[in-house]
């Protein structure tokens, strides 16, 4: 499979700490509840993609952590949430980050809590250059046949450190299939079983790629 343009999304992480004021759970009016503020923040952050990002663009904001307290009868001082953001375009990535910061600041003011927000950019989006992608398409078609090459399928919301190479030089990230057998699972899956029959296709592809590239140089 070969993409012209975005292939894999960026992978960013964020953490937010909500500091309130602990109190006995039977007397919540004596404190500032960070759990309540955190729950409202989780819901509010879901509006970032839904109401800030152009529907024709793609972005994901997933909350994956919520930690607060360890007793049934105590409102804790602090709640912590965290998660991940995925996007393909740098401007969408920045837009999501800024919207999250704005919501965190406003939510702290609304509940009288102190909300700290930290956004950490990870792998950038993996974006193929068109010329190199079309070159790779031709080579793949020579090796496997045109019907075996998927062109511009839906990109992945995963992440890939090859993106750093593509920021420095034009290039192309390609996918090599594992075949239709039982071992064909998604990435990071314990049931994945590499199909040795795919090796000759991979080797032939890279050899042909070098031959064609040097011939055109």
Give the residues covered by each predicted segment.
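Fold-level recognition of mixed alpha/beta catalytic cores in primary-metabolism enzymes, strongest
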Residues: 1-43
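Metal-dependent amide/peptide-bond hydrolase catalytic core
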Residues: 36-217
């Amino acid at each position: 499979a070969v993409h012209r343009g975005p292939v894999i999304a960026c992978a960013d992480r964020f953490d937010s700490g909500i500091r309130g004021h602990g109190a006995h759970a039977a007397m919540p009016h004596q404190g500032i509840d960070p759990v309540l503020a955190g729950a409202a923040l989780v819901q509010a952050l879901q509006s970032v993609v839904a109401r800030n990002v152009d529907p024709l663009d793609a972005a994901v904001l997933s909350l994956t952590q919520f930690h607060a307290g360890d007793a049934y009868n105590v409102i804790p001082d602090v709640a912590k949430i965290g998660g991940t953001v995925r996007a393909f375009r740098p401007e969408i990535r920045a837009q999501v980050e800024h919207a999250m910061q704005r919501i965190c600041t406003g939510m702290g003011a609304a509940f009288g809590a102190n909300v700290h927000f930290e956004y950490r950019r990870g792998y950038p989006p993996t974006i193929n250059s068109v010329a190199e992608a079309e070159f790779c398409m031709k080579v793949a078609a020579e090796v496997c046949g045109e019907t075996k090459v998927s062109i511009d399928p839906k990109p992945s919301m995963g992440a890939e450190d090859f993106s750093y190479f593509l920021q420095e030089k034009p290039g192309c990230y390609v996918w090599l299939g594992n075949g239709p057998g039982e071992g064909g699972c998604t990435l990071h899956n314990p049931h994945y079983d590499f199909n040795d029959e795919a090796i000759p296709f991979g080797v032939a592809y890279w050899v042909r790629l070098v031959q064609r590239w040097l011939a055109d140089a």
